[in-house]
A protein has these predicted regions:
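Bacterial N-terminal signal peptides that target proteins for export
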Residues: 1-8
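N-terminal regions that are enriched for targeting/export leaders
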Residues: 23-82
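Second-shell loop/turn segments in exported
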Residues: 78-90, 153-159, 310-318, 327-328, ...
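Papain-like cysteine protease catalytic cores
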Residues: 119-252
Length: 472
């Protein structure tokens, strides 16, 4: 009896302590009264509430002085090309990367020949390779507990449709490319959610099975045989949703007006890659990033931020915006478009296709300020690289300094500026994150930095945890 009373008393004491701890940090009745008392009781606030209650916040926050005609002149501009639409998918990285490759092909032929690459074809192998990356990652970490940070990383997101330019390079080199007309988009390529959900669920199931096989002491050979069987199921699911990858096709290139040039030829995907790209992509470019949290002129690498198990992680040189701008300008002046990525949802006037830090004045509407720096926004998960677009033009002042930039987007030709977006240089500085630059436009001192042994960054880092938020 005494023991029972002691246990009850101990539990009661614990609950009282827990209650006291909660109350000390919670919103008390007195605190709530103070909060309510601090609210302005002006008629203007009542008017603001009535306006916000019936309208979109962005519409009410628009800076009227920024609503004039947008200057569409650019002193440096690469040749225009057709605009694509990624639809309800997170494949912006692929659209931007292939935009660069098809632009390079046209440029190498005096802009007299065009090519449209199949996104569906490359996406098939992207999803198959990411499935293998997950399964092999589970095997490699199978002796760690499920609560381990790396194990949780894999099971949290076994498969996604986001990515980076290193994925385009690795996948295209390994599997080749095919024309869009040979393997066009399917419904699931343009609407990835359900397909991805089903394959993701299957991968998690397989991941648990592989962990059990390791725990039971199965041989590596037996485990690899089973993994191959698992990937066969994934392959079938992808074949039924995206179509089985083309292995050989007949194709004739077309001029700018869509007229066929020459006699049609038969290609394999690898042969078509050699015909259009002409050689390895890896090793020809650097990936620059602006992350003000970390020291500049250092090389970093993001663990497991790759598309294929045997491929390349996202390795980048951290640079000031000014250095990145100068490399971009040099490339654009030579007619070369660039893969780039941004936090596109910030201060975006989507209808006008215009990005400027003064597009919306949320602070005045709510009677507060939003003063965080770029570094602070990254550290607190408030900002990061969310959407890839193709940098295509820059407008320079009399001193050669950038005023504004232009990008080809992948939200369709009816979006923004005929499928493009214009961004002011001040917006570029705040919300630009990644740029892929051919090494011929990179200064020698930065090339030397790129050769450093990279500092490894964990994939849970805030800058990489929000990738692909705004892609769709």
């Amino acid at each position: 009896m005494n023991t029972r009373h002691s246990v009850l008393g101990f539990c009661l004491a614990l609950s009282l302590v827990a209650g006291a701890q909660t109350n000390s940090g919670g919103i008390s009745a007195d605190m709530l009264r103070q909060i309510e008392k601090a609210q302005p009781a002006s008629s203007s606030d009542k008017a603001i509430f009535n306006a916000i209650a019936s309208n979109n916040i962005d519409d009410l926050s628009k800076n009227f002085r920024n609503q004039g005609p947008i200057d569409t002149y650019f002193s440096v501009e690469t040749p225009k090309q057709s605009i694509h639409d990624q639809k309800s998918s997170g494949r912006c990285w692929m659209f931007s990367g292939l935009n660069v490759l098809r632009s390079n092909f046209s440029r190498n032929h005096g802009d007299s020949i065009t090519v449209e690459f199949s996104h569906d074809y490359l996406f098939f192998f992207d999803q198959l390779e990411k499935s293998n990356l997950f399964l092999q990652g589970v095997i490699d970490n199978a002796k760690k507990p499920m609560e381990d940070e790396r194990v949780r990383f894999f099971f949290k997101s076994p498969l996604n449709d986001g990515g980076t330019f290193c994925g385009v390079a690795d996948l295209a080199e390994k599997y080749g490319l095919v024309p869009k007309s040979v393997q066009p988009e399917t419904f699931s390529a343009e609407n990835t959610r359900i397909m991805s959900r089903l394959i993701t669920s299957k991968l998690r199931e397989y991941g648990l099975e592989l962990r059990k096989m390791v725990a039971d002491g199965k041989s590596q050979k037996t485990i690899q045989v089973r993994k191959t069987e698992m990937l066969s199921t994934v392959y079938r699911m992808l074949s039924l949703t995206l179509g089985e990858p083309v292995k050989e096709f007949t194709y004739a290139f077309k001029d700018k007006n869509g007229k066929a040039i020459g006699t049609p030829k038969t290609y394999t995907p690898q042969e078509f890659y050699q015909e259009t790209v002409g050689g390895p992509l890896n090793g020809t470019f650097i990936m620059a990033m602006n992350d003000p949290r970390r020291p500049y002129y250092q090389t970093y690498e993001v663990e497991y931020d790759r598309h294929t198990y045997d491929g390349h992680n996202w390795k980048y040189v951290n640079l000031p915006v000014e250095d990145i701008s100068q490399m971009a300008i040099a490339s654009l002046k030579d007619g070369r478009k660039l893969y780039s990525s941004y936090d596109v949802g910030k201060q975006l006037d989507r209808k006008r296709g215009y990005l400027d830090t003064d597009n919306f004045d949320y602070g005045t509407l709510f009677g507060t300020t939003f003063p965080m720096t770029k570094a602070e926004r990254i550290s607190t998960f408030d900002s990061g690289s969310t959407h890839a677009m193709t940098l295509t033009a820059v407008d320079l002042d009399a001193n050669g300094k950038p005023i504004k930039w232009k990008v080809e987007n992948s939200w369709g030709a009816d979006n923004g500026q005929k499928g493009c977006m214009i961004m002011t240089n001040r917006w570029f500085g705040e919300y630009m994150f990644r740029l892929v630059v051919d090494k011929k436009y990179v200064p020698e001192n930065i090339l030397k930095v790129e050769q450093q042994k990279p500092i490894m960054v964990m994939p849970e880092d805030p800058l990489f945890g929000v990738d692909n938020d705004e892609c769709q």
